[in-house]
């Protein structure tokens, strides 16, 4: 396990219509500013996708133990919240190894996450040495209801509405969630790459190399004091302790006019 990356955590605040903003609503209500990311413009977490009534578990050879779970794909993390639970599982995007859509009996979402202490408490690893250096846990999310199944819920849906997420049931819900995870992981990796570039820019501006010593050996006093600002072509850049009586380097410029001189043309008989 990489000690530098964020780990999975348990959270006690469930996303609702009051503490998150669906991405479609955010686009309608917030102006876009050039050079400013969406995360900096929104005061609330942005909900890119998710859905209700997922069967959540892991791939096993025996009959899997699945439970009804809500999935929230936020701009900052992936959140799994089992039904009737008082806490949810927060998965940072840095911990996601891969995600995909798999066709089994029905379409299901596959999520491979790097193991840590939190995941080990929920899904204990197999005893014995691990065959790979990177220990991962493969989870699956399968919709309980198909796209056109009729079922009744005791609560009115206010977050995953048709206006913001379209037809978000069955296979369509799996595809929507997979696309939302891909979108969020893309700008997370892009932001991490930009941070790495900023760290590279903070490095030294000049490096001493053997080539520099070859061009300017020790004890050599240059005639021109070049500071890298194109000041080596002026007389002010000449040092006073240069060679006396020698040929001074210089530059001669000649400007010629291309205009023709008018002449009188003699007509021959």
Swiss-Prot record:
Signal peptide: none annotated. It comes from the Eukaryota. Its main location: cytoplasm. InterPro entries: ICln/Lot5/Saf5. One of its GO terms (cellular component) is spliceosomal complex. Keywords: Cytoplasm, Nucleus. GO terms for biological process: mRNA cis splicing, via spliceosome; spliceosomal snRNP assembly. It is found in: Cytoplasm; Nucleus. Pfam families: Voldacs. Belongs to the LOT5 family. This is Protein LOT5. The lineage of its organism: Eukaryota, Fungi, Dikarya, Ascomycota, Saccharomycotina.
């Amino acid at each position: 396990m990489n000690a530098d990356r964020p780990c999975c955590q348990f959270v006690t605040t469930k996303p609702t219509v009051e503490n998150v903003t669906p991405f479609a609503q955010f686009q309608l209500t917030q102006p876009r500013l050039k050079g400013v990311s969406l995360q900096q413009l929104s005061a609330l977490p942005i909900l890119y996708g998710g859905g209700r009534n997922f069967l959540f578990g892991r791939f096993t050879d025996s009959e899997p133990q699945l439970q009804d779970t809500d999935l929230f794909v936020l701009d900052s993390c992936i959140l799994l919240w089992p039904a009737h639970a008082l806490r949810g599982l927060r998965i940072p995007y840095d911990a996601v190894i891969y995600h995909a859509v798999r066709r089994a009996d029905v379409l299901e979402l596959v999520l491979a996450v790097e193991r840590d202490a939190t995941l080990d408490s929920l899904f204990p690893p197999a005893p014995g040495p691990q065959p790979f250096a990177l220990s991962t846990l493969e989870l699956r999310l399968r919709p309980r209801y198909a796209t056109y199944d009729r079922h009744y819920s005791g609560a009115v849906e206010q977050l995953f509405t048709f206006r913001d997420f379209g037809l978000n049931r069955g296979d369509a819900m799996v595809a929507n969630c997979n696309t939302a995870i891909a979108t969020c992981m893309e700008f997370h990796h892009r932001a991490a790459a930009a941070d790495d570039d900023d760290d590279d820019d903070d490095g030294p501006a000049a490096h001493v190399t053997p080539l520099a010593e070859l061009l300017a050996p020790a004890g050599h006093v240059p005639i021109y004091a070049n500071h890298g600002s194109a000041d080596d072509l002026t007389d002010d850049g000449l040092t006073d302790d240069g060679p006396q009586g020698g040929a001074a380097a210089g530059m001669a410029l000649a400007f010629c006019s291309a205009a023709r001189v008018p002449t009188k043309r003699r007509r021959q008989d």
